[in-house]
């Protein structure tokens, strides 16, 4: 590999030349404007890009081991198939930039601002994203084992088919974040803020959400077996067709939450608020509803066999065609055994079918 000086690099960029197969180990490009540069198979190990501007620059198959990008500004920058082990992007600003099939093990992204950044098929083991501002960033099919994303803020971020079981999100906040088919099993999400987040078809078994905010979150089709959901605020959250078997949900807010078709077998809701909760067609055999406030809740067509409703508060709580064999009640005051109008409509429909026969 040949060598180039910083001035020669700048000249080649201005001429539109591709800079390829050169050894630039340890070179200082501090504060340089490398916008529009095209680099292929260049060794930038130990180089210093601090405060540089990389707008619409492309780096392909380059080596960036322990390279310093602190306070760099990347806009529409592409890093593809690069080895960036232990590189440092601390206090960098990354906008609409892409890391594709890059090795980013132990890379530091501390206190960075990321807008529309994409990490696709990257190796991010032990990467450090402490105190990041993520706005519309995307993680796709990347490895995040032991990566640190502590004290970070996520807005409209997407995690697509990610294994997040060993990722550290301590003290982070998530707003409208999408987790699509992700694996979180056994994760510790205590005291985290999740607002209007999507957990569609996720694996959340044994996840600890205690004392977290889950308002307006969507857990449709997700598995939450043995999950810890105590002292949470899950107001107007969606648990449609979710599996909360043996989940611990006591002393929590589920007002306006929707559980249609969910599995709630042996789920513990003791002392929780379930006002206006929609629990139609749930299977809640052996579930615990002791001391719950179920004002205006709808349990139509649910299987509540052997469940415990002692000391629960009912007011216009609908048990329309609800299975209740072996269920325990202190009293049934406030329970509507059926919806008269719906009952009449069902009877009429049954009669019409019989006449056709």
Feature locations, PLM:
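Tandem repeat scaffolds
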Residues: 2-357
